[in-house]
Amino acid sequence: MSSSPTTVGVVFGGCSGEHDVSIRSAQTVAKGLTLGANRERYRVVLVYIDRDGRWWGPDLAGKVLSSGCPPADSDLPQPLPAPGFRGLPAGTDVVAVWYPVLHGPNGEDGTIQGLFELMQQPYVGAGVLGSAVSMDKQAMKAALAGAGLAQVPYVCAQADELSDAARQEALLKRIESGLCYPCFIKPANLGSSVGISKARNREELIHGLRLAATLDPRLVVEQGVQARELECAVLGGTTLRASVVGEVRFDADWYDYETKYTDGRSTTLIPAPLPDGIVEAIRSQSIQACAAVGVTGMARVDFFYDDSRDRVWLNEINTLPGFTSQSMYPMLWEASGVTLEQLVHELLESAGQ
């Protein structure tokens, strides 16, 4: 007699700017949970978090997933409850393991992971510490530097350094003394290139800092480099393994949000055409990086590679990488011999480890 299926709570949507991407990622995860043997292994309960942080149960969540679009306010049941988390929706008390598919703040920064910890229920992906450190680029860079992993030169900044002319001038001089143009200004706690800008001169630097400061009080400015963009996927519980290495090529000046999520704007090469030594270095450093920040479960680790100088720099760790039909994480594992059916199963098997 076969055992009863495990009930998986797939949570998607969220308050971040990556809300729509989360819906698309959840579609892929839900598909994977219905493929092959997973049909017998798992029962899926969908939970949708709207842009105001309200949690909705399977009925509305199923409609959102089917349409692929967030509902209009007029389509939500009235009267609307107060924004934010007010308890689990009806129909979710049967969930045995949670599968968060939430990109950006509140999803991959340790927030929802902390909620699952308080509920004493297992969940897919990195824990509170690994999620929080990886999300904050300042904290992540400090941890990676402590592990001896090479990164491009960078300067950390605070939004309040732009509060008056004297402090702003001091910040600009600090950046210009440590970095050359072009450089990239990033909010420390957003993903999918949201809020990132490229500065070729001081005027653009000021504009980029002010833009990023509207989104995050913590900022990072990085040296621009002429390099290829490479990505490696990591999977596992207490023991991690790395996928083949992929490359992203794009027609834009840099890999911004529109380029990432618009069909035809970027091309992926899997596996990337690279020397064997570089491939092994990237795979090894991907696992080292996850260990440095305490990440288990899954991650996508991004690198820069200057083939003219044979130099590799670690860029960042994404603990809840995109899972859409054009996202690198599932494609890297597919090229490594792990199907979508196997991938979501392994991720669920690693939950709680």
From Swiss-Prot:
UniProt keyword annotation of Zinc present: no
Subcellular localization, as worded in the UniProt entry: Cytoplasm
InterPro entries (alphabetical): ATP-grasp (IPR011761), ATP_grasp_subdomain_1 (IPR013815), D-Ala_lig_Van_CS (IPR000291), D_ala_D_ala (IPR005905), Dala_Dala_lig_C (IPR011095), Dala_Dala_lig_N (IPR011127), PreATP-grasp_dom_sf (IPR016185)
Signal peptide residues on this chain, from the entry's feature table: none
Assigned EC number: 6.3.2.4
Cofactor binding note from Swiss-Prot or TrEMBL: Binds 2 magnesium or manganese ions per subunit.
SUPFAM superfamilies in the record: Glutathione synthetase ATP-binding domain-like (SSF56059), PreATP-grasp domain (SSF52440)
Reactions catalysed, as given in the entry: 2 D-alanine + ATP = D-alanyl-D-alanine + ADP + phosphate + H(+)
Residues reported to bind Mg(2+) 1: 302, 316
Annotated ATP binding sites: 176-231
One Gene Ontology term, aspect cellular component: cytosol
GO biological process: cell wall organization; peptidoglycan biosynthetic process; regulation of cell shape
Top EC class for this record: ligase
GO molecular-function terms, A-Z: ATP binding; D-alanine-D-alanine ligase activity; metal ion binding
Recorded metabolic or biological pathway in which this protein acts: Cell wall biogenesis; peptidoglycan biosynthesis
Domain ATP-grasp: 141-349
Cofactor(s) demanded: Mg(2+); Mn(2+)
Binding positions (Mg(2+) 2): 316, 318
Pfam families: Dala_Dala_lig_C, Dala_Dala_lig_N
Record keywords, A-Z: ATP-binding, Cell shape, Cell wall biogenesis/degradation, Cytoplasm, Ligase, Magnesium, Manganese, Metal-binding, Nucleotide-binding, Peptidoglycan synthesis
Family: Belongs to the D-alanine--D-alanine ligase family.
Described function: Cell wall formation.
The name this protein goes by in its record: D-alanine--D-alanine ligase
Naturally occurring in which organism (per UniProt): Parasynechococcus marenigrum (strain WH8102)
The organism's taxonomic lineage, starting at the top: Bacteria, Bacillati, Cyanobacteriota, Cyanophyceae, Synechococcales
Gene: ddl
